[in-house]
Amino acid sequence: SSLANIGWMMVVFPLSPNIAVLNIIIYIFMSIPTFFLMEKMTLKTLQDMTTAWTTSTTANIMLTLMFLSLSGLPPLTGFAPKLLILNQLVMENLTPIATLMAIMSLLNLFFYMRTTYVMTMTTPPTSPQNMMKWRHKLHFHKLLPTLIIASLMNIPLLPMITTM
C-alpha cells in the first residue's frame, strides 16, 4: 500500500507538490486508525483476520471499510487523492500515464479486496473448544472514532481542501 502510494506521489510531485503533500496527509490519516485497530485486535497475519469478527464485530466492520478506503475505492476518502492526481495528469496532457496509473491501481484494490474477503466472508475450520475467542472489552482511545470517520468520509470536504 505505501509503495503504491509513493508511486502516486512521485508521479504528481513535479506537477503539483501541493497535491502530493495532500496525498501523504490523507494517507497518514487513513493509516493511523487502521494500524491502531489492527494492534488492538492483535491482527498480524491473514490467518488472524479470519477470526477477527469474533473479537469485535464492529471493529471488524470498521477495519474492513478502512481497508477499502486505503485501496482508493470510491466514494471513500482514499479515492480523493487519486482523483486529484488523475485530474492533474489529464490537465497536463499526460492522459496515457493517468490511464496506466488508474489501471495499475487495480492491483492494489485486488490486494485489499482479498484481505476484506478473508476478514468478512471466510471462517477457518474450528473445533468446539476454539470456536470463539475470549471477548475482552476492547478499550480504544477516545480519538479513534474521530480518526475512523476522518479516514472514511472526508470526500465531501474535497472541494474545500483543494481551494486552499
Give each language-model segment a name.
Residues 1-164:
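Core, highly hydrophobic multi-pass alpha-helical transmembrane subunits of bioenergetic inner membranes
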